[in-house]
Curated annotation (Swiss-Prot):
It comes from Microcebus murinus. One of its GO terms (molecular function) is DNA-binding transcription factor activity, RNA polymerase II-specific. Its main location: nucleus. Residues 46-65, 80-96 have a biased composition (Gly residues). Residues 105-156 form the bHLH domain. It comes from the Eukaryota. It holds the Pfam family HLH. PROSITE patterns: BHLH (PS50888). SMART domains: HLH. Acts as a transcriptional regulator. Inhibits myogenesis by sequestrating E proteins, inhibiting trans-activation by MEF2, and inhibiting DNA-binding by MYOD1 through physical interaction. This interaction probably involves the basic domains of both proteins. Also represses expression of pro-inflammatory cytokines such as TNFA and IL1B. Regulates cranial suture patterning and fusion. Activates transcription as a heterodimer with E proteins. Regulates gene expression differentially, depending on dimer composition. The keyword Cell membrane does not apply. Residues 1-102 are annotated as: Disordered. This is Twist-related protein 1.
């Protein structure tokens, strides 16, 4: 019996069947692994698209499309911001000419006041020169006119103290003024003016 079993050859049909049964068993695990990898990769890709990165990518892609509503809203917002900035610039530009005009008016008013002050001062000095007896060669400046006026007042005080004028002559203002003018001119020419002015 042992010889029959050992010596009995295996038919090629049985070998082909056994080989065919073994081959699918060997081939199934790799195919299953490959399918699992493909499914995992597809799940990962789907998850990446649905995740934060996918959402961000989709948002950026949607913003890049020219006809997307998101871009239209952003464009409107940016246009509104630009309009607001332009309005602010126009308001500031409108305020600057007003300040410049105010400065100009202030300068004009200051110039007018200075001219009035100078004119009134010149008129006062002209009136003082008419009162003070002067020589034909006198070309007095303002400070010289003030000094001469002070000396003339001092001279009048001395005249009143000396009682050189008579009561009759003093009653006539015109004659008294003429005599005082002459006496003051003589007093100046004698050097009293130069001596007193030097002090």
């Amino acid at each position: 019996m042992m010889q029959d079993v050992s010596s009995s050859p295996v038919s090629p049909a049985d070998d082909s069947l056994s080989n065919s049964e073994e081959e699918p068993d060997r081939q199934q695990p790799p195919s299953g692994k490959r399918g699992g990898r493909k499914r995992r990769s597809s799940r990962r890709s789907a998850g990446g698209g649905a995740g934060p990165g996918g959402a961000a990518g989709g948002g950026v892609g949607g913003g890049d499309e020219p006809g997307s509503p998101a871009q239209g809203k952003r464009g409107k917002k940016s246009a509104g911001c630009g309009g607001g900035a332009g309005g602010g610039g126009s308001s500031s530009g409108g305020g600057s000419p007003q300040s410049y005009e105010e400065l100009q008016t202030q300068r004009v008013m200051a110039n007018v006041r200075e001219r009035q002050r100078t004119q009134s001062l010149n008129e006062a000095f002209a009136a003082l020169r008419k009162i003070i007896p002067t020589l034909p060669s006198d070309k007095l400046s303002k400070i010289q006119t003030l000094k001469l006026a002070a000396r003339y007042i001092d001279f009048l005080y001395q005249v009143l103290q000396s009682d050189e004028l008579d009561s009759k002559m003093a009653s006539c203002s015109y004659v008294a003024h003429e005599r005082l003018s002459y006496a003051f001119s003589v007093w100046r020419m004698e050097g009293a003016w130069s001596m007193s002015a030097s002090h």
